[in-house]
């Protein structure tokens, strides 16, 4: 009996210690007036998507520095604490735990699809609003992703809009389309939705090809694709793989019109692919720095000038990162309490936020965390992307 009592006391003690230990792992408590709001950053600088991840991260950091130079948000400076996780999901999970437990951040600026989807349950448990550079359709599901927000059109919505544009503009019978993507959560994200929508509107998906993010030769895939004679090929890649596809397509003298989703699009593609990028069509979710007449570009130009830089020094992915951080700052501005829950509620108050033309206006509510489904399209002409549509949607 005595031993049972001692055992019970020891068990109670261990449980109490466990509870105390769990308590020490909680995320940040409410930030007091005048204290900085800490935001975590998951960056890909050296990994498989570092070609676009590096300028994107630079844009996020730049906006935070800019808004802090203006006094911050509602008396709070923003402290962005982040690191390179090299596009590796286990490293993203480790970094997330550090940001949550050690740094006590109140929200997260994330990056990839695989890591964002792997973390979404943890993010919900920890009540940390999470903006990702992944525009996976899965993140629209509020039951599974109640703290995730999409700040641009989802990959699936991008693909649907491209297919709608093809349907509306193709001449001569039923359009035949191929899909080219990498074997990652990012690459595969829009594929099933694209196939379903194509069937719905009467566009034929005739082929699919897998191309690695780091591919240096895509000849075999393109030869196989060409057997199906697609009129169009939709690419979901970043600049590196897309440039390889375009260069090999030029060598093979393919007549297919290549159309890339947002991460395949940008100045970096033209720089790498050269003449092979001519007439490539890209999905444009965010403005190019050379669109200088846009109202929102004035703030970017002001910041860069203070650093001795010019708009010409930056690319579209820098603008994309800038806009993402700007939307987060707006959510913080709207928050009644500087906690994860408070910031989420602040983001859900954003209604038709005017981004000065840097991106489509965004709206969030308690029932909808997808800010927009609109994109623009641009074609490479004489080595430069020229936008040829307004903001459009498949709806």
Give, region by region, the residue ranges found by the protein language model.
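Short, low-complexity disordered leader/linker segments with a strong preference
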Residues: 1-38, 69, 392-395
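Extracytoplasmic "Venus flytrap"
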Residues: 31-59, 83-90, 112, 180-188, ...
């Amino acid at each position: 009996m005595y031993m049972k009592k001692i055992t019970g006391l020891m068990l109670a003690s261990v449980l109490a210690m466990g509870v105390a230990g769990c308590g020490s792992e909680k995320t940040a408590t409410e930030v007091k007036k005048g204290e900085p709001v800490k935001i975590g950053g998951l960056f890909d600088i050296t990994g498989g998507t570092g070609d676009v991840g590096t300028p994107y991260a630079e844009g996020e950091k730049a906006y935070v520095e800019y808004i802090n130079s203006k006094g911050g948000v509602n008396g709070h400076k923003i402290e962005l604490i982040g690191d390179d996780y090299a596009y590796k999901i286990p490293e993203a999970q480790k970094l997330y735990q550090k940001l949550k437990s050690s740094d006590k951040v109140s929200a997260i600026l994330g990056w990839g699809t695989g890591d964002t989807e792997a973390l979404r349950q943890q993010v919900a448990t920890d009540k940390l609003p999470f903006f990702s550079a992944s525009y996976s359709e899965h993140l629209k599901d509020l039951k599974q992703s109640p703290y995730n927000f999409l700040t641009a059109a989802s990959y699936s919505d991008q693909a649907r809009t491209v297919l709608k544009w093809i349907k509306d503009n193709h001449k001569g019978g039923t359009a035949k389309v191929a899909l080219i993507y990498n074997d990652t959560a990012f690459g595969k994200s829009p594929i099933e939705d694209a196939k379903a929508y194509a069937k719905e509107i009467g566009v034929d998906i005739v082929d699919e090809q897998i191309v690695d993010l780091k591919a240096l030769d895509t000849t075999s895939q393109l030869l196989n694709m060409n057997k199906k004679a697609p009129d169009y090929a939709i690419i979901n890649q970043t600049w590196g793989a897309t440039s390889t596809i375009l260069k090999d397509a030029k060598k093979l003298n393919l007549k297919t019109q290549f159309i890339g989703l947002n991460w395949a699009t940008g100045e970096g593609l033209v720089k790498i692919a050269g003449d092979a990028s001519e007439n490539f069509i890209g999905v444009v979710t965010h403005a190019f720095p050379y669109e200088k007449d846009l109202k929102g570009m004035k703030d970017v130009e002001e910041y860069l000038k203070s650093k001795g830089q010019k708009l010409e020094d930056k690319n579209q992915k820098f603008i994309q990162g800038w806009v993402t951080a700007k939307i987060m700052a707006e959510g913080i501005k709207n928050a009644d309490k500087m906690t994860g829950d408070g910031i989420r509620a602040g983001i859900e108050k954003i209604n038709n936020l005017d981004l000065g033309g840097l991106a489509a206006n965004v709206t969030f509510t308690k029932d909808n965390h997808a800010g927009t489904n609109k994109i623009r399209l641009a074609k490479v002409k004489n080595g430069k992307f020229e936008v040829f549509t307004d903001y459009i949607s498949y709806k």
